Amino acid sequence: MTLRFEASCPDGLCPGWSVILKGETPPEASKFEINFLCDRDDRVAFHFNPRFTESDIICNSYMANRWGQEERCNHFPLGVEEPFQIEIYSDNDHFHVYIDKAKVMQYKHRVEDLKTITKLQVVNDVKISSLEITKKLFY
């Protein structure tokens, strides 16, 4: 696992926060991950994992020392060495995922206390050109 970015947000990243990652993948890319981590117990509230070798996006949560049921999105709009923008934002019920401004999926929260989601991590085969974490206004 190669760490590309990590940030702590002690007040919590959910709900109402938006993460916008701009980047591209290197020619040898097989996968990368965006993880929303909890402040205790090594829990992963949301694991977003595009896999280029499978042309699939795997999402999951790691709770109570085990991975939950995978959710797959077989719409795969990412290409190796092609620039992209991924936005992930959270409301009270879901993480919403947009790639190049088109919604590709939503993932129901599996963590009850959303304020415990305090860390963002990006790992593996991705070259980050910018990453922005902002409060999103809901209308």
UniProtKB/Swiss-Prot annotation:
Localized to the lens of early embryos (48 hpf), particularly in lens fiber cells (at protein level). In the adult, expression is highest in the eye but is also present in oocytes, brain and intestine. It comes from the Eukaryota. PROSITE patterns: GALECTIN. Transmembrane segments: none annotated. GO terms for molecular function: carbohydrate binding; lactose binding. InterPro entries: ConA-like_dom_sf, Galectin-like, Galectin_CRD. Residues 5-134 form the Galectin domain. CDD domains: GLECT. It holds the Pfam family Gal-bind_lectin. Keywords: Lectin. One of its GO terms (biological process) is camera-type eye development. Signal peptide: none annotated. Binds lactose. Homodimer. The galectin domain, in contrast to the one in mammalian ortholog, is a functional carbohydrate-binding galectin. This is Grifin.
